[in-house]
């Protein structure tokens, strides 16, 4: 009972660990121990085959050259027998026995036809839905464990790299005693050798870790089962193959359909597969090379570029050269003479300033620019017309004002009754007489205008009031036609 109680207490107190960490009783990491051998047979050391023992004959043999058989003698001549056992005198019997054992190992394949028993669909007694939540829980736990392993690996790599750096410092003896197991710290030879061993071991571990990280990155980039997809892709879906070329892939050819090629020679198989590749990807290119030492017109070497293969150099035979030369006339001509185009010669139209930076102007921008230029020209013309109209309107207003100032004098000189009772001829005569009288009554100071040039007059009287109180309008220059 006491034993069972202690076991139960241990089970209750001890926690279940998902990953084991190698630590000693003090809670420190285990030290490197180079005194005790890790393996019985060192995997890094190369094995050397000293001798071979024939189980049937029981003789020690160095090599095949030592084992000789005479035509008239059936006994084997070799080294002295090490082990006493019944040994065979005839080599043919040994070969026969080997053949018998090999024939016994062959398996006879029996062909069975599967009977098509159509079963009625029934309800699943153990559906997957019952285990779905547990499966999700374990998946999450597994992902957490993987992430924790990655973090622990990174931390361990950092720790080892720090130790290797400290071993290169002046106080490397202190770090070496903490990391490796040393029998005598005062022995300089032991300290130096173990320092070199620890550094070499740490560097190898870090190198393995980096290579593992690189491989994991490459596997993450590569899509799952990419090779299997390539083998199942049909010949029509070539863009997928050209993104990542698989030279071993043959279109419309399964690995199990080689029964047709059993009775064909290797050269015929190569020609057959080459024709398939040429049908899908295009023909191969052959470039004949001439050698200076050979006769003129004779080509001894050629560069061959087949589809989905790297180009290679071959030494041509007379048969190959003749076959290629016969194919040359059937090929299309390389160059064709094209006639000169009429619009090829440039004709000088106008001279334009080209900027230093040449930029291609799109047609849309060019049309917009032309429209804006036209609209600007139209706006300028409209402004000019409006300016002329305003000037004319101002002149007309000034004339009307002058006429209004003159009209009271006319009313004073001629009464209304006399004007209404007069005829048209009389009115015209009187108006002419009145105008002459008004001109005579005008102040002579106002009528006199100082004689000056047109430019000076415009500058002095451009929209300014003179001493006489008359507002002089600006004079507009006449444009040359």
UniProtKB/Swiss-Prot annotation:
Coiled-coil regions, chain positions: 90-120, 139-160
GO molecular function: acetyltransferase activity; histone acetyltransferase activity
InterPro entries in UniProt: Cullin_homology, Sas4, Sas4_dom
Keywords from the UniProt entry: Chromatin regulator, Coiled coil, Nucleus, Repressor, Transcription, Transcription regulation
Location in the cell: Nucleus
Pfam families: SAS4
Record note on disruption phenotype: Heterochromatin spreading downstream of the silent mating-type locus HMR.
Region (Disordered): 319-338
Main location: nucleus
Keyword Cell inner membrane: no
GO BP term, example: subtelomeric heterochromatin formation
GO CC, any one term: nucleus
Subunit structure: Interacts with ASF1. Component of the SAS complex, at least composed of SAS2, SAS4 and SAS5. These three proteins constitute the core of the complex and are sufficient to acetylate histones.
Described function: Component of the SAS complex, a multiprotein complex that acetylates 'Lys-16' of histone H4 and 'Lys-14' of histone H3. The SAS complex is however unable to acetylate nucleosomal histones. The complex is involved in transcriptional silencing at telomeres and at HML locus. Also involved in rDNA silencing. In the complex, SAS4 is essential for histone acetyltransferase (HAT) activity of the complex.
Note, other: Present with 800 molecules/cell in log phase SD medium.
Protein's recorded name: Something about silencing protein 4
Species assigned in the record: Saccharomyces cerevisiae (strain ATCC 204508 / S288c) (Baker's yeast)
Gene: SAS4
